[in-house]
Regions:
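Long, His/Glu/Asp-enriched segments that create or flank divalent metal/ion-associated functional microenvironments
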Residues: 1-247
């Protein structure tokens, strides 16, 4: 309702209805300590296989203020609305999917909602700022790991000491970054893509004549592509046949 009341983006009625929730397995929580989104909100929370201390770390890491801060990243207008629209607009462009667009869009909304005053209480503001710090820390530890400047244990300590993560959650976060199929730039793509979309918003909406809704609808309907190419498409800039984006 916060999104639609401000006419920020079109949310089809069906998109509101078709998402669901399920509990994340204890095994998966070892690499995904926080809830995930898409057409299903997968809840990371204490299970009966955890020790008491592990349950407390899970509760603290998924407290209501931290979770409220990223619900729009995972659900609407984030990954759930993304996936809903991608199935309906230009699905052939899925071959050109990039995390700079996919994750950048979700993080862009975290920044925009902060600007719009979505965080109403000091606790909610801390929740949003915690995740902002987390996104930045991901860039630092993941790139340093791939450059062989940090070990996994050093990455865990970095998240505990510099971000304030619970140790179990920091360990799972590091596993997620390195044990899966993520490329070396995946974690950087959140922030870089988000900042690129933010800059495009400034150009077309804040300094241009586009409305928020027009801008956000256009991005979703163009499907996934490098943000520089998206800008060229939205501005109808001429492109040569061999043109390549710098990002």
């Amino acid at each position: 309702e916060y999104i639609t009341a401000r006419d920020l983006v079109t949310v089809p009625d069906l998109a509101r209805e078709v998402w669901r929730t399920q509990m994340m397995s204890p095994e998966r929580q070892r690499v995904s300590p926080f809830f995930l989104g898409g057409d299903t909100i997968i809840i990371s929370y204490p299970t009966d296989t955890m020790t008491h201390e592990e349950k407390l770390m899970s509760l603290r890491g998924n407290n209501p203020h931290f979770s409220r801060a990223v619900v729009h990243h995972e659900l609407i207008p984030g990954h759930h609305l993304q996936q809903f629209m991608l199935k309906r607009y230009r699905p052939y462009r899925s071959e050109f999917a990039t995390p700079f667009w996919m994750e950048g869009w979700a993080l862009y909304w975290e920044m925009l909602l902060w600007d719009l005053g979505f965080a109403e209480t000091p606790e909610d503001k801390i929740g949003m700022l915690f995740w902002r710090k987390h996104r930045c820390a991901r860039i630092i530890f993941s790139l340093n790991y791939h450059l062989k400047r940090m070990t996994p244990d050093e990455c865990i300590e970095y998240l505990v000491d510099r971000v304030g993560h619970e140790r179990n959650n920091a360990t799972a976060e590091v596993r997620r970054s390195f044990a899966g199929s993520y490329g070396p730039l995946y974690q950087a793509a959140y922030m870089l893509g988000g900042l690129q979309i933010r800059q495009l918003h400034e150009e077309l909406v804040q300094k241009g004549s586009w409305s928020n809704r027009q801008f956000h609808d256009a991005i979703l309907q163009e499907h996934s592509m490098p943000i520089e190419m998206l800008r060229a498409k939205l501005l109808q800039l001429p492109l040569e046949a061999d043109w390549q984006p710098t990002w």
